[in-house]
């Protein structure tokens, strides 16, 4: 594990993107933490987020030729991360999709560079995996190849079965998923920072009940 993962979690805490307490997930589970990437909503925080994505993508070793951001959250992530990758000497095109097809102007659902080669999907999290599945269909329909998925946080918890949403994507499509940080990294943060000590046991219990290896 490299320090940037811990730096990302601390940054998320400072931005109130990551919170500890008692929360109810969409699946109806009582969770001791909550992560809302939508709160990276100003220029400075989006810039820093994109730097973390770029570093995570480079360290993952995934081979890719361009980025694709599924609407809507993935749009700004693809654009901002492409800028940060360019600063690191990796200049790649990016594209995104519209929710509704246009019948005038550019037309269609795709905007940006043509989907070609190995395409890395970038999103905030993988919950049900719907966004990833739709992205894969779009990419393959254009004759390109999905290369993997970059996300901000892997919650590492079971879905309806024994696998997590991330593991299901990896198994079903054979694609690598590169998170900036995971539940394991969050657990390390709690262990190493006494000010968060009260949340260590609740997170441990949650991981024991819902977590995956």
UniProtKB/Swiss-Prot annotation:
Binding residues annotated for orotate, in chain numbering: 34-35, 127, 155
Protein name: Orotate phosphoribosyltransferase
Gene3D superfamilies linked to this entry: 3.40.50.2020
A Gene Ontology BP annotation from the UniProt entry: 'de novo' pyrimidine nucleobase biosynthetic process
Keywords from the named record: Glycosyltransferase, Magnesium, Pyrimidine biosynthesis, Transferase
Protein's job: Catalyzes the transfer of a ribosyl phosphate group from 5-phosphoribose 1-diphosphate to orotate, leading to the formation of orotidine monophosphate (OMP).
Naturally occurring in which organism (per UniProt): Neisseria meningitidis serogroup C (strain 053442)
Pathway as given in its UniProt record: Pyrimidine metabolism; UMP biosynthesis via de novo pathway; UMP from orotate: step 1/2
Residues binding 5-phospho-alpha-D-ribose 1-diphosphate: 26, 72-73, 98-99, 102, 104, 123-131
